[in-house]
Curated annotation (Swiss-Prot):
One of its GO terms (cellular component) is plasma membrane. Residues 29-125, 772-791, 796-892 are annotated as: Disordered. Residues 862-878 have a biased composition (Pro residues). The keyword Membrane applies. GO terms for molecular function: mechanosensitive monoatomic ion channel activity. Probable component of the mechanotransducer (MET) non-selective cation channel. GO terms for biological process: detection of mechanical stimulus involved in sensory perception of sound; inner ear development; inner ear morphogenesis; neuromast development; vestibular reflex. This is Transmembrane channel-like protein 2-B. The lineage of its organism: Eukaryota, Metazoa, Chordata, Craniata, Vertebrata. The keyword Membrane applies.
């Protein structure tokens, strides 16, 4: 009790003392704050500061040594120890030491700051490496297979580390330069990122094409990608033609109405503005900048002395050169993507199932498009898999394919004969008065060619059903047949057209002779009347009254423009009637009709890939050929492609349905590019023929007054270049040599690119084949091991009382082998494993009758591990491993 009383009193005194001490400290703090505000320090504070200074001096004297040299040595040793530590550890140690350090160590903080500022080169290098590693972690953090919580934590720590220690690299020598380099690096990274985003945003119609691809597959989207590429090509050609030919003539040439070639003839002026005349590109359209005959033959025009005839010829040929370069470059770039569109990789469906979704999508519409795109890609892969597993009668299939090709050849021959006959009829109509002809007779050629391009592709598609190719291969055959159709029609048209040109040249010679005789008669009469032989003024005849030649170049240009415009009209009307009106009928009349309009006839239309692609390619061929005779044709084609993108995208999304067998398109459009390259060469030949062979018209165009069009080049060489250059060009400008060398170089380039592409594809296929062989060999090894174990188990059952079975080793006792279940049934062929490879004996087939089960008298063995994937569950056949494991109950 006494002890408790003493303890209680001691606690009371302690509590009272603590409370009194707190009150005194509170009073002292208040008085100190008041005196600080008044600017007068407290006497107690002065004594405390003096005491602290004495303690600091004593601590430095005890720890640092008795001299300045000793203190410097201690400081140097401490600095060396800190250098051995990593930078983050050093910082942590510094923080810990600062927390442990007493208030008396505040005076040494300046020394630590001086140590920070004087880092060695090794520390700087280590710090740079760690900062770069953190930056790489920030850049590649998205690819890490971590949880989002861990990613955010690592990102925050890495960013704090970079922000903290990146500034330390700039301390000391070269601080400003390093800070400037860091700032410029960050600015450059941000600029590159913004520029990439800007380039992506500047890709025209990207979102529209992605939407089409998500609903209709990559095969339909490949057409719109090709259409966008064609639009870019024609935009560049439009810039060349208008910038170097049309605009110089408009700004620096002779104004309209001053010379006969820029004036409507007197007999045509009354009907020059009629719609029927303008619709056929006659009247004022014929004598405008759209066509060849409008341009003057002056060697130089304007104050710039611009050589318009030379520019016209070089631009007309340069269009082909630029197009050839772009097409070959695109084919070479696409060759690396390679393949025929089939996915030759393994585990296709697993990759699509687990990696198709984009988890950064935040827009519901984008999510719907991505869902549709994933579904379509599964359909494409299923079609490829079905085609690989298809079994067919090869002899019947060959017969049907031969029959289909014979029918298609008959169609091609009939279409060519029809076009030739129609062009011959049009030549007969041209000799008659145009007022006596009907609209059908005037436009018979264009109508027949457009109708053949409209009717033959569906006919070819119906015949191709006999062949039963894979959809991708069937598309290539369809493209080739329509290509042959369009090519035959086009060249039949050209042959007939050049026959007409020869007739116009004969007519032009007669008109030229009449004009020459009229001028000679005028000069002779003027000389006799005024007795003057020099400085005779030309005849005062109005430009509209001058006798004109037929100007065959303008007539050829008009034919190409009419073909292009009629093709646009037929295409748009086909979409409007065949797709839109058909979709309206199916959509609104399906509820009140006798049969199901969606499932039966007429149903919704499918997008015709082959017809649209070939139409686009041959329309471009007509642009290449017609641009030399009608410079305004390139501008018309640019407007056509621009409107086609919006019009056809709307028609596909609103009126069409996906193909019944959705297939994957080629990862590169090289098949389309190959057809385009062939059309480019075929389009170049008529233009080269007219430049090198046919004489230009004498009263229209920039080459009038010359024997051949290429004489402009020789004239420029003779008048603008030194004489020795003229000799060199005269030897090198042999037309046969030039054409042969150009064609040889082009074909060599194509052969080289094709060979390189095939070599890369073959090497890739060989590597894939080797990898597949190794994988199959590994599977066979595993399956053979399993089947061998099964045979050995069955042989064990045949041995009497298992007297010949060797005793199991220690390892086998510890790790018993897994055995399949007796009750499970094996499906498939006998002797085939589950994967289709290796030797595998059926489990239901036994080599002999089962031995009688002996009673189990030993202790149960260790429990077996669970079955592997693909193996059945349940007890194994044969003698049990222990009590209650498949054998009879033990006898008691």
């Amino acid at each position: 009790m006494c002890v408790l009383q003493l303890g209680w009193k001691w606690m009371q005194n302690l509590i009272v003392e603590v409370m009194w001490t707190q009150k005194e400290e509170q009073k002292a703090g208040i008085n100190q704050n008041l005196r600080r505000e008044e600017g007068k320090p407290n006497q107690q504070t002065v004594w405390r500061r003096a005491k602290k200074r004495r303690m600091n001096r004593r601590a430095r004297g005890e720890a640092g040594g008795r001299s300045k040299k000793m203190r410097m040595r201690v400081r140097k040793n401490r600095r060396e120890e800190e250098r051995k530590l990593s930078i983050p550890g050093r910082e942590q140690q510094r923080k810990t030491s600062q927390r442990r350090r007493s208030p008396s160590s505040c005076s040494s903080s300046s020394d630590n700051n001086s140590d920070d500022e004087s880092m060695s080169e090794g520390e700087m290098a280590r710090l740079k490496e760690e900062v770069e590693e953190k930056k790489k972690l920030i850049a590649t953090l998205r690819n890490k297979p971590w949880r989002m919580k861990r990613r955010l934590k690592c990102l925050k720590e890495a960013q704090e580390f970079v922000e903290k220690f990146e500034g330390a690299l700039g301390k000391g020598k070269g601080r400003r330069l390093y800070a400037f380099k860091v700032m410029m690096t960050k600015k450059l990274i941000k600029f590159n990122r913004d520029f990439e985003n800007f380039k992506t945003a500047c890709i025209p119609w990207e979102s529209r094409i992605k939407e089409v691809e998500s609903h209709f597959g990559s095969s339909v989207a490949s057409y719109f990608i090709f259409l966008r590429w064609m639009y870019g090509l024609n935009l560049v050609l439009f810039g060349f033609m208008f910038g170097l030919v049309v605009i110089p003539e408009l700004l620096m040439g002779i104004p309209y109405g001053s010379i006969p070639r820029k004036t409507v003839p007197r007999e045509e002026q009354d009907s020059a503005m009629d719609f029927s005349v303008l619709f056929e590109f006659g009247g004022y359209c014929k004598y405008s900048i759209l066509f060849y005959g409008f341009y003057n033959n002056q060697r130089t025009i304007g104050f710039l002395q611009f050589r318009l005839p030379l520019s016209y010829l070089l631009v007309g040929v340069g269009i082909f050169g630029y197009s050839l370069m772009v097409v070959i470059r695109t084919m070479a770039r696409n060759a690396n993507e390679g393949g025929d569109g089939g996915d030759e990789g393994n585990f296709t469906f697993c990759w699509k199932l687990f990696t198709s979704w984009d988890y950064l999508i935040g827009n519901p519409e984008t999510a719907d498009n991505k869902f549709a795109s994933t579904t379509t890609s599964f359909k494409e892969s299923i079609v490829d898999e079905q085609e690989n597993l298809k079994d067919e009668n090869i002899h019947l299939r060959r017969f049907l394919r031969l029959l289909a090709n014979v029918l298609i050849l008959c169609c091609l021959a009939g279409s060519g004969y029809l076009i030739y006959a129609v062009v011959k009829r049009s030549q007969d109509f041209a000799k008659r008065d145009r007022n006596e002809l009907t609209w059908l007779q005037k436009n018979e050629v264009e109508i027949v060619m457009s109708l053949l391009g409209l009717v033959c592709p569906p006919l070819f598609e119906a015949i191709a059903e006999l062949e039963d190719y894979h959809p991708r291969i069937a598309l290539k055959w369809q493209l080739g047949r329509i290509f042959a159709l369009f090519l035959g029609n086009l060249y039949t048209f050209l042959f007939a057209l050049f026959d007409e040109v020869n007739g116009k040249l004969e007519n032009e010679k007669q008109i030229k002779n009449q004009t020459v005789w009229a001028l000679k008669e005028y000069y002779a009469n003027y000389t006799l009347q005024y007795n003057i032989t020099e400085n005779i003024p030309p005849p005062n005849i109005a430009p509209a009254d001058v006798i004109r030649g037929p100007c065959w170049e303008t007539e050829v240009g008009i034919e190409f423009v009419k073909l292009t415009v009629s093709d646009i009209q037929v295409t748009y009307l086909t979409i409007l009637i065949g797709d839109f009106l058909r979709a309206l009928i199916v959509r609104f009349l399906n509820y009140c009709w006798c049969w199901d309009l969606e499932a039966g006839f007429p149903s919704y239309a499918e997008f015709d890939i082959s017809g649209n692609v070939l139409g686009l390619i041959f329309n471009q061929g007509m642009i290449w050929m017609g641009a030399f005779y009608a410079p305004g044709l390139v501008g018309i084609n640019v407007l056509r492609l621009l409107s086609s993108m919006y019009y056809q995208c709307w028609a596909v999304m609103a009126c069409n349905v996906p193909h019944e067998r959705v297939f994957k398109a080629s990862r590169s459009n090289n098949f389309y590019m190959g057809l385009l390259l062939l059309v480019l060469f075929l389009s170049l030949m008529p233009v080269i023929y007219s430049i090198m062979t046919l004489p230009p018209s004498f009263d229209c165009g920039p080459f009038s007054g010359k024997d051949k069009m290429y004489d402009v080049i020789t004239e420029t060489i003779d008048k603008d270049l030194p004489p020795f250059m003229a000799d060199i060009f005269s030897y090198a400008s042999n037309p046969g040599l030039i054409i042969s060398v150009v064609l040889l170089m082009v074909w060599l380039a194509i052969y080289y690119l094709n060979a390189v592409s095939k070599a890369y594809q073959n090497s890739n296929l060989e590597l894939k084949r080797k990898m597949q062989m190794q994988r199959d060999e590994e599977k066979n090894r595993r399956n053979n091991k399993d089947s061998t174990n099964q045979v050995m188990k069955d042989l064990e059952d045949l041995l009497p009382n298992k007297s010949l079975i060797p005793p199991p080793s220690v390892e086998e006792t510890e790790k018993p082998a897994e055995q399949p279940s007796k009750s499970s049934k094996v499906t498939g062929k006998p002797g085939a494993a589950a994967s289709g490879k290796g030797v595998h004996v059926q489990k239901d087939v036994s080599l002999a009758a089962a031995n009688p089960r002996a009673p189990v008298t030993r202790a149960p063995g260790p429990r077996q591990p669970g079955p592997l994937p693909g193996n059945p569950r349940g007890p194994p056949p044969g003698q049990g491993m222990g009590r209650g494991r498949g054998g009879p109950p033990p006898r008691r």
